[in-house]
Amino acid sequence: MAKYLGIDVGATWTRAILVDEGGSVLSRAKIRTGVSPVAEIAEVVAGWDFDAVGVGSIGPMDLKTGVVVNSPNSPSRRFPLVEPLKKFKRPVVVANDCVAAVWGEYVFKYHVDNMAYLTLSTGVGVGAIVNGVLLLGKDGNAHELGHAVIDFKSPRRCGCGGLGHFEAFVGGANMPSFYQEVAGEGPLLPEEIFKRAREGYRKAVEFLDVWLDALAAGVATILAAYDPELLIVGGSIALNNWDIVGRELPKRLVKYLGVRGAEIRPASFGDDEVAIGAAALAYKTPETLKKFGYPR
């Protein structure tokens, strides 16, 4: 049976997994994301045997060149995805991390022709399949709705430099300063905010009320843009706090939606979500990626 290497380049961690054609995980590896994360994880998996490799990476990226460009949350704002893997002499496919994640859900789990994926982690990202077609855009960044403006009067600056972006309010890297702004104390890390809210600390509860409304406003934009039947939500902030996010998000969406909503479910593969999606890209490469010359 063929085996596929999936690499997940995140802002904090870079992961690699080896899967078979059914999506079963055979091996795992994880390192801190460095200035050249694909080259660094390639050294770790040098002894693994695989037939093709996929990479799901934080963006934005230039799919034509296979390079991440101007990434706001990583140690290096620009780094190659394809070049460090050529030494393996295996087909290589790359895409944005959330594009990989939604493709993994499509191939290995749900097979829904209209679905979207949202990650809530260090940053915010989106991937979408519409009428069975994986959306990419001219450079591979059709899904960068973390940079959709949800408050055009806000002075809050996103890591990319823009004002009022979805990610500037709900992304993990921005939550401490947002908490400080709303609560008048802190800053606090996301895990501490949720912990204190569960303990009933008033300022944390009041902050999450604002944060969840910002989340719902951004999700309403995703649903309006892609009209999915199913929205998958992943990333550490969402999955570690699904008791709150999963309960509150559908309720708060109602006031922002002018279109029919979508079923909302947590990501199927936990921390492996993007890496499994990357392996799925290598296993069943979507037609839209083939137009960019993948596999290479």
UniProtKB/Swiss-Prot annotation:
Record family assignment: Belongs to the ROK (NagC/XylR) family.
Protein name per the record: Glucokinase
Biological process per Gene Ontology, one example term: glucose metabolic process
Entry keyword Kinase: yes
Subunit structure: Homodimer.
Reactions mediated catalytically: D-glucose + ATP = D-glucose 6-phosphate + ADP + H(+)
NCBIfam families the record matches: GK_Pyrobac
Cofactor(s) of this protein: a divalent metal cation
Key words of the record: ATP-binding, Carbohydrate metabolism, Glucose metabolism, Kinase, Magnesium, Nucleotide-binding, Transferase
Enzyme class: transferase
Transmembrane segments: none
InterPro entries the UniProt entry points to: ATPase_NBD, GK_pyrobaculum-type, ROK
Enzyme Commission number, as recorded: 2.7.1.2
GO molecular function: ATP binding; glucokinase activity; N-acylmannosamine kinase activity; UDP-N-acetylglucosamine 2-epimerase activity
pH dependence comment: Optimum pH is 8.0-8.5.
Cofactor note: Mg(2+) is the most effective ion.
The protein's role, per its UniProt record: Catalyzes the phosphorylation of D-glucose to D-glucose 6-phosphate using ATP as the phosphate donor. Has a broad hexose specificity, and in addition to glucose, which shows the highest catalytic efficiency, it can also phosphorylate fructose, mannose, galactose and sorbitol. Can also use CTP, GTP or UTP as phosphoryl donor.
Temperature dependence: Optimum temperature is 95 degrees Celsius. Highly thermostable.
Keyword Transferase in annotation: yes
